[in-house]
């Protein structure tokens, strides 16, 4: 029987009829062609009452949509417009009907408009007008049941005629024995096709003639209906392995291949109708494509395996592209599981195509991606027989399996098939209602428009084939519209003669529903003011195949001339083709079988058409049942994400990347890095940022964009895991024989081979990933393997147990760190295992990014002669014939793996084997975690899976999310709470929900600037980042970077060789290597020493020795038996001069008293390191402020202990001789040593605010361990006081008092005035901020704005009380001062003990000034009475009753004590130590938060400390240090050449390689690169610091210089940058490189600038911004203190009650 297929998807002519031969076939075609119009073959109407109700509901929905359209218009519509709106409404309703999951979803009015917007934005809406009835002869044949099918001719020849009218005879001559020989009976192609095109010996009824439809096909059986109970077995043996047999059993002989489903008798077809629909539009899953795939013997394929796929664009089984480089042979173990998965997916409406990559025994192996005769996607084929040429091209649907191609949208001439189209649409509606009422969704293949992209498939010209364009009728010319959303990549197969190789088949039906009408039209209709046009030359992807011959190109060109409306698109295509041809260096496009030529049929190209790459509306979808990832728009977004990765860190010199658009995307990155504009007009900025933000936070398990991207990254990351299997020794030998064994590598579903790896999409500060490890998604990902821009070929995780049991074969989730990190998707060689008895083939993989791999491995072959856009494999027979990768220029400093030998990429390289083992043991102790968590993690050691880290034995570990604070109120946004955000980088603002709701109107204030609420993005604070992974280059095992002590910053672009600890131990013990010397990686001891650090260290070591002696004596042991703290290092890592500006309101009160406007001080950071398990761990840190003798009163000679922090990892954990913890003893000694140092330098007092951090927050070290509890304020205060008591015993501290008693009270004989002007004014202290708030409240009370009478009454009472207390001057500022002190005292009094004043020198009892010179007059009787010289003179002038002691008759004698040994000058003799990361506490905390340098466990503390030391030894190299004299661009480290004679002549690598520096008379030498240096060296660090200082000096000079011919080096260059900054329209926020670098320098300058009237541009603005950040931090700290005090008061009240 001949089953004719129609566009409607129905099965027509079901009745029994004979298949006619020859031209009589036209009778069937004509008859079939009338079916859509007349309903013939459909039977009576099956529209039930339910259908009528649905029709009424749909009509009501159309009217509702029509009304919405009318309401969106600014003016009333005329009749013509109304008709247009109704037509649009009809099309929109059809789209809504198709995407609705349930009836409730369909009618839901609350989501109607969003769904409409999604349809409009997510689809080209003109595809419904492009469906046409097709009465082609593409009928699937049901073979006669019960007869065995055999064949003996391995070389199948078929007719390749597109129609009988073209060749006169279209018969398939069948012998009486039905041997399956397909004889060429003529045809328009003039001969048999290439030997490689394999056709099944399909059984035709005896005497039926076996009419075969038009084109050659890999499998006819893919469309045949399976007949249960009948097995088509083969009678041939191995000699026939070129012949394809139809058998569903896995037990057929080695010459046969299980390729076809079983046949279904006619009696069952009606039962299948609902599931199958049109047989020509749906195909059964041809699962058992290779021999021995492992299907259950005799198992019938379930009906749910029906593929619901449109036959569009020549992709019969699959509307997607088919990868040409991966074998899809199923492993035995998991084949049934995969089979069942396919069944489940099919039941969900997720069609799968045939998987029939059939190996020939000795011929060419063509997967379903081989090219075939007709240009199905580019020509009109057989219009005599194809009465309507639709998206379905002229080939058979199963032939579409042979193409690797993308869906095609053919735009017909407007009125050509109007009648058939309308009939089809009506028929389509009837079918949808009758077939799928239960699901309320249409699964009909032709009811789906799964094309949103106009792909042009160019097919390779085969020998003996005519150019099909010569035989194409012109009645229905197809127009190729390259729309702005066209960005599909396309892959065609590359035919090969040599060696039997497998090219893959993957197919999957596309369930997405397009919406008719042009999207821009409707968008303009709905949102007439929101349409923004973009450049026609926007970035887009265009599928470009290899041109076959010039005649073919001429045909395309003639077509473009014939269709004038498409001239622009075709012009673009020709331009792209020409460009692509130029890229194809060394490839032979005209040769069909060019194994060695490197010809590529499916190429990936990013062209400059329109803005089709714009990933707009990344989350909008019009797809059903999770099949949205087959939507071409989602594929666009996937490819855009991956191309963004490539461009981020493309290693090619600028302009040298094989993809010319790489530069464009790099500019886009640079723009987005600082772009904060909500409606940025920069091309592709907004949609790209939207896509990136979605990808960053995507948690959807079925996300059609992110899941395939992650799957691709998984494929790349795990490719090396498949490289070294146990047959690696046979890897160089080629495959010899027919089949692929059942344990061959199967590419996992969802492996998208897309653009080359590059940078992660997010951020800047993150360390680079050596390799990215991605967890295999739990749901089936898109089965297609797409060829994308600059893609590489690799194989995803194998499903066989053989691979799954390998512990070095892992995957895990990728959580791209939020800032700066690089991604290296490692691509390796992989081994395709053949069936037993055959040798392995080692297939090399082309690494496609220039300069990605420095040197090729000697035993591995890199396909550098292949275009970077090619995705294919080659059988490597002669390694010496293949070129090395064009990556690195030098082979020096490389390892055996071909990677640069960068020393110290992991700190374990410095360890001895025993230290490595100790480190691993320490990892599994989980020090820092609670007991329960530690035990849980330790238990995982006994159940390590393949995904577990080989060091810590745990699979998935996530970082603590950094805290987020509300900009207006400063409150911390809680975990999992919603918030709003806007901006980027330092200018990002956050708004908590209460602040957002309290802000009325359309704007909200952020730091005084109104922000439109429309710009705010609502988010949830639930982001998680997984720990990074790294893979050993030796054993391929995966470890956490933190466990491996891997320094991503030293990874040299992802290419540094990494050896895991286990391999390292083995190599050391086998004497293959030695541990690096300790000096190879600079540590804490290598940091600069200062007088302060030496003083504290010497004191600490001395006291530890004394403590150890005391402990030995107390315990009755010898000195050596007592454990003590060892390997301690103290360093000052930052020592810079700063200025503290007095807050304006406070300054206003004391302006008449000549109060200083600013205070100069020196900020210092002191850190303590201890070597624990071989790693120097930062355990303790403190920030101090030193106000010297040159500082104005009241801060003169004062020290403020600003912040102090520690983590509880100190070793050993023992008690000291006095009972306190040894760690406490050490920390106390550090503080006492610092106070002693301050006293020796002449400082008189130290101020300490004993304020513990708020729960969940940190002062210096980010993320404390769970085992370390945050102390209460009283505990912390006692900790400080215990330290001060020790210092008092040693005579270092003279007196300890609190701030309130010293400055707010006049006790005893104190004669000092109570005024706020006496209070020491410190940066970040409690009272200056609190005073500013109080002054503001007082000013509001005076103005009557707040409290009115109540406020005035309170002020009056306060003044009266002050007057009664003896205060007489209550006017003006004096009154404000007294009121301020009164209210401030009320605020401070409850917590006065927390504000500790430490006097290092005696203070005068009368004036309270600390005495540093002259004499102090001491009372002979009173112990604590002493006054200064000035007060003594005043004392002598007083009357006797007012002299000391007051109110006593007997007066005491005073005698002088000379004050000695106090330096007059407190100036620091240490050098300035600058560190941008330690400049402020917040800067260091931000560094740690942004890079996840956490201290919550010892393992993380070790890694974090290692990275902190790296940053300290490698300060950021300043910009403009080295500039190319030719192109005037900056030269990165190791990327340039320097003249040995001229002091300032440098050229970059690009300019040097272009002209070789021939224009310069002297010799040029290459700059040293990171790989050429040892791990680090001090001289380089000092040089960088010196260069940075010079650059900052230059910045200050240039801002003041007025000379046009200044001789100051580079002065004119900086002035030019100033001028550029004034005129630049892009700015730093827009991505301007010069502006960004200038901005960086300005920020460095502003942090260090002490000039209040600085002339450097933007200096004041930057300082104001920093001030606001500090103010927010201080406000949070004060708020935390007040909350603590309220809780304390509540506790006291509750206790007393």
UniProtKB/Swiss-Prot annotation:
Rosette leaves, stems and flowers. Residues 17-28, 202-217, 399-439 have a biased composition (Low complexity). Zn(2+) 1 binds at residues 1404, 1407, 1428, 1431. Zn(2+) 4 binds at residues 1539, 1542, 1560, 1562. Keywords: Activator, Acyltransferase, Chromatin regulator, Metal-binding, Nucleus, Repeat, Transcription, Transcription regulation, Transferase, Zinc, Zinc-finger. It comes from the Eukaryota. A zinc finger (PHD-type) spans 989-1066. GO terms for cellular component: nucleus. CDD domains: PHD_HAC_like, ZZ_CBP. Residues 1-16, 385-398, 556-571, 584-628 have a biased composition (Polar residues). Zn(2+) 2 binds at residues 1419, 1422, 1444, 1452. Residues 1081-1517 form the CBP/p300-type HAT domain. Acetyl-CoA binds at residues 1204-1206, 1223-1224, 1279. Residues 1-45, 202-221, 385-439, 555-574, 583-631, 843-901 are annotated as: Disordered. A zinc finger (ZZ-type) spans 1399-1462, 1519-1572. It catalyses: L-lysyl-[protein] + acetyl-CoA = N(6)-acetyl-L-lysyl-[protein] + CoA + H(+). Acetyltransferase enzyme. Acetylates histones, giving a specific tag for transcriptional activation. This is Histone acetyltransferase HAC1. It comes from Arabidopsis thaliana (Mouse-ear cress).
């Amino acid at each position: 029987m001949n089953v004719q297929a129609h566009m409607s998807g129905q099965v027509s002519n079901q009745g029994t009829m004979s298949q006619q031969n020859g031209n009589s076939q036209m009778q069937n075609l004509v008859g079939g062609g009338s079916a859509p119009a007349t309903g013939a073959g459909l039977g009576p109407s099956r529209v039930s009452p339910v259908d009528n109700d649905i029709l009424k509901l749909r009509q009501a929905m159309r009217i509702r949509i029509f009304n919405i359209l009318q309401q969106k218009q600014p003016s009333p519509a005329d009749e013509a417009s109304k008709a247009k709106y109704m037509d649009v409404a009809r099309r929109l309703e059809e789209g809504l009907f198709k995407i609705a999951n349930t009836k409730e979803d369909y009618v839901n009015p609350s989501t109607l408009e969003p769904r409409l917007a999604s349809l409009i934005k997510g689809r080209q809406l003109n595809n419904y007008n492009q469906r046409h009835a097709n009465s082609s002869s593409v009928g699937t044949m049901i073979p006669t049941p019960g007869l065995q099918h055999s064949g003996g001719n391995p070389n199948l020849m078929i007719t390749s005629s597109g129609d009988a009218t073209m060749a006169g005879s279209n018969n398939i001559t069948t012998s009486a024995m039905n041997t399956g020989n397909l004889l060429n009976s003529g045809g328009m192609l003039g001969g048999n096709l290439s030997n490689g095109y394999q056709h099944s010996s399909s059984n035709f009824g005896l005497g039926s003639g076996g009419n075969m439809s038009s084109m050659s096909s890999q499998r006819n059986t893919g469309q045949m209906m399976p007949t249960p109970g009948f097995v088509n077995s083969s009678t041939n043996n191995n000699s026939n392995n070129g012949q394809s047999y139809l058998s569903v059993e896995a037990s057929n002989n080695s010459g046969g291949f299980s390729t076809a489903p079983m046949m279904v008798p006619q009696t069952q077809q009606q039962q299948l109708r609902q599931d199958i629909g049109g047989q020509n539009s749906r195909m059964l899953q041809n699962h058992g494509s290779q021999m021995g795939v492992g299907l259950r013997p005799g198992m019938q394929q379930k009906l749910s395996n029906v593929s619901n796929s449109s036959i569009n664009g020549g992709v019969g089984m699959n509307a997607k592209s088919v990868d040409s480089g991966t074998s899809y042979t199923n492993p035995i173990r998991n084949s049934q599981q995969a089979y069942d998965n396919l069944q489940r997916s099919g039941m969900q409406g997720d069609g799968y195509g045939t998987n029939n990559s059939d190996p020939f025994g000795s011929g060419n192996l063509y997967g379903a991606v081989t090219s075939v005769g007709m240009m199905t996607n580019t020509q009109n084929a057989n219009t005599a027989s194809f009465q309507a040429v639709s998206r379905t091209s002229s080939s058979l649907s199963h032939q579409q399996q042979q193409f690797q191609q993308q869906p095609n949208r053919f735009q017909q001439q407007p009125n050509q098939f109007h009648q058939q189209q309308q009939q089809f649409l009506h028929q389509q509606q009837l079918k949808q209602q009758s077939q799928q009422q239960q699901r309320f969704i249409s699964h009909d293949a032709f009811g789906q428009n799964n094309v949103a992209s106009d792909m042009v498939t160019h097919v390779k010209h085969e020998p003996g084939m005519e150019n099909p364009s010569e035989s194409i009728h012109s009645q229905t010319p197809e127009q190729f519209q390259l729309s702005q959303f066209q960005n599909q990549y396309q892959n065609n197969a590359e035919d090969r003669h040599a060696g039997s190789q497998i090219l893959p088949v993957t197919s999957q039906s596309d369930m997405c529903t397009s919406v008719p009408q042009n999207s821009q039209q409707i968008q303009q209709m709905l949102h007439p003011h929101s349409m923004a046009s973009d450049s026609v030359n926007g970035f887009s992807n265009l599928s470009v195949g290899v041109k076959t011959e010039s005649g073919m190109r001429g045909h395309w060109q003639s077509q473009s001339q014939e269709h004038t409306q498409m001239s622009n698109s075709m012009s673009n295509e020709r331009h792209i083709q020409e460009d692509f041809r130029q890229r194809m260096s060394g490839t032979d496009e005209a040769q069909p079988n060019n194994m060695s030529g490197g010809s590529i049929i499916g190429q990936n190209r990013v062209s400059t058409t329109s803005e089709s790459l714009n990933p707009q509306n990344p989350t909008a979808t019009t797809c059903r049942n999770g099949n949205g990832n087959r939507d071409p728009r989602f594929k666009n977004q996937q490819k855009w994400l991956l191309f963004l990765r490539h461009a981020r860190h493309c290693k090619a010199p600028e302009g040298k990347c094989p993809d010319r658009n790489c530069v464009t995307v790099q500019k886009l990155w640079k723009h987005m890095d600082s772009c904060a504009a909500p409606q940025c007009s920069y091309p592709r900025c907004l949609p790209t940022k939207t896509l990136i933000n979605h990808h960053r936070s995507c948690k959807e398990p079925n996300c059609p964009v992110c899941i395939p991207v992650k799957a691709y990254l998984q494929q790349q990351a795990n490719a090396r895991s498949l490289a070294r299997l146990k047959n690696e020794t046979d890897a160089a030998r080629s495959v010899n024989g027919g089949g692929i064994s059942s344990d061959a590598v199967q590419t996992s579903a969802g492996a998208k081979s897309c653009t080359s790896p590059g940078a992660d999409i997010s951020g800047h500060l993150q360390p680079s990933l050596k390799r990215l490890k991605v967890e295999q998604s739990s749901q089936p990902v898109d089965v297609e393997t797409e060829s994308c821009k600059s893609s590489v070929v690799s194989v995803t995780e194998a499903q066989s147990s053989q691979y799954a049991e390998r512990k070095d074969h892992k995957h895990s989730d990728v959580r791209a760190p939020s800032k700066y990190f690089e991604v290296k998707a490692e691509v390796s060689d992989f081994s395709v295992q053949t069936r037993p008895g055959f040798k392995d083939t080692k297939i090399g993989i082309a690494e496609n990014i220039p300069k990605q791999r420095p040197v090729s491995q000697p035993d591995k072959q890199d396909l550098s002669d292949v275009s970077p856009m090619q995705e294919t494999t080659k059988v490597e027979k002669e390694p010496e014939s293949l070129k090395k990768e064009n990556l690195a220029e030098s082979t020096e400093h490389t390892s055996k793996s071909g990677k640069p030998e960068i020393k110290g990429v992991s700190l374990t390289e410095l360890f001895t084997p025993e230290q490595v083992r100790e480190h691993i043991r320490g990892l599994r102790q989980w020090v820092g975690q609670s007991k329960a968590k530690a035990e849980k993690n330790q238990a995982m050691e006994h159940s390590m899976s393949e995904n577990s880290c080989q060091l810590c034995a745990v699979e998935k570990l996530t970082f603590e999310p950094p805290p987020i604070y509300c900009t207006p109120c400063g409150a911390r946004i809680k975990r999992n709470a919603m918030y709003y955000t806007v901006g980027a980088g330092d200018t990002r603002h956050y708004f908590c929900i209460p602040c957002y709701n309290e802000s009325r109107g359309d704007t909200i204030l952020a730091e005084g600037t109104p922000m439109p609420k429309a710009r705010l993005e609502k988010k949830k604070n639930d982001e998680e980042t997984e720990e990074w992974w790294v893979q050993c280059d030796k054993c391929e095992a995966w470890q956490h970077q933190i466990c491996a002590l891997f320094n991503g910053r030293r990874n040299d672009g992802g290419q540094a060789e990494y050896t895991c600890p286990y391999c390292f131990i083995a190599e050391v013990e086998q004497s293959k290597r030695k541990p690096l010397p300790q000096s190879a990686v600079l540590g804490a001891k290598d940091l600069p020493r200062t007088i302060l650090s030496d003083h504290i260290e010497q004191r600490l070591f001395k006291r530890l020795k004394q403590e150890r002696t005391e402990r030995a004596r107390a315990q009755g042991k010898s000195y050596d038996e007592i454990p003590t703290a060892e390997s301690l290092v103290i360093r000052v890592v930052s020592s810079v001069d700063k200025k503290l500006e007095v807050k304006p309101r406070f300054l206003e009160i004391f302006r008449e008293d000549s109060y200083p406007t600013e205070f100069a001080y020196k900020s210092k950071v002191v850190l303590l390191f201890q070597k624990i398990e071989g790693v120097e761990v930062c355990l303790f840190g403190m920030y101090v402020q030193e106000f010297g003798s040159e500082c104005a009163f009241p801060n003169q000679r004062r020290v403020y202990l600003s912040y102090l922090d520690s983590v509880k990892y100190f070793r050993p954990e023992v008690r000291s001789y006095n009972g306190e913890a040894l760690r406490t003893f050490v920390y106390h000694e550090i503080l006492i040593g610092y106070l002693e140092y301050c006293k020796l330098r002449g400082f008189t007092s130290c101020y300490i605010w004993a304020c513990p951090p708020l729960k969940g927050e940190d002062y210096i070290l980010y993320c404390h361990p769970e085992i370390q509890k945050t102390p209460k304020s009283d505990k912390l205060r006692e900790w400080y006081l215990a330290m001060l008591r020790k210092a008092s015993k040693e005579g270092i501290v003279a007196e300890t008092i609190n701030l309130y008693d010293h400055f707010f009270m006049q006790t005893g004989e104190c004669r000092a005035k109570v005024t706020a002007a006496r209070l020491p004014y410190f940066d970040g202290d409690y009272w200056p901020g609190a005073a500013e708030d109080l002054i503001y409240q007082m000013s509001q009370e005076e103005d009557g704005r707040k409290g009115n009478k109540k406020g005035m009454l309170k002020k009056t009472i306060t003044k009266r009380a002050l007057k009664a207390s003896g205060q007489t001057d209550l006017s003006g500022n004096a009154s404000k001062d007294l009121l301020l002190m009164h209210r401030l005292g009320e605020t401070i009094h409850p917590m006065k003990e927390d504000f500790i004043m430490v006097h290092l020198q005696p203070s005068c009892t009368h004036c309270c000034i600390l005495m540093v010179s002259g004499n102090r007059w001491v009372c002979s009787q009173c112990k604590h009475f002493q006054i200064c010289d000035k007060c003594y003179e005043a004392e002598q002038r007083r009357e006797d009753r007012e002299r000391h002691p007051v109110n006593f008759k007997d007066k005491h004698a005073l005698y002088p004590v000379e004050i000695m040994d106090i330096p007059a000058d407190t100036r620091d003799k240490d050098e300035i130590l600058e560190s941008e990361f330690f400049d402020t506490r917040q800067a260091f905390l931000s560094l740690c938060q942004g890079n996840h340098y956490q201290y919550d466990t010892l393992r993380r503390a070790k890694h974090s400390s290692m990275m902190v030391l790296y940053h300290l030894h490698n300060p950021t190299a300043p910009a403009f240090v080295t500039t190319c004299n030719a192109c005037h661009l900056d030269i990165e480290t190791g990327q340039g050449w320097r003249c040995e004679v001229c002091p300032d002549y440098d050229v970059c690598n690009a300019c040097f390689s272009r002209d070789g520096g021939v224009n310069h008379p002297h010799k040029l030498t290459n700059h040293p690169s990171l790989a050429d240096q040892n791990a680090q060296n001090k001289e380089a660090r000092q040089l960088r610091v010196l260069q940075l200082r010079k650059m900052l000096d230059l910045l200050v000079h240039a801002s003041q210089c007025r000379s046009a011919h200044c001789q100051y080096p580079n002065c004119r260059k900086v002035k030019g940058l100033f001028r550029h900054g004034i005129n630049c329209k892009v700015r730093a926020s827009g991505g301007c490189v010069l502006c960004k670098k200038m901005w960086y320098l300005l920020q460095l300058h502003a942090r260090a600038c002490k000039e209040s009237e600085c002339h450097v541009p933007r200096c004041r603005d930057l300082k104001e911004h920093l001030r606001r950040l500090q103010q927010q931090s201080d406000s949070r700290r004060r708020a935390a203190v007040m909350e603590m005090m309220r809780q304390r008061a509540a506790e006291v009240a509750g206790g007393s009650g």
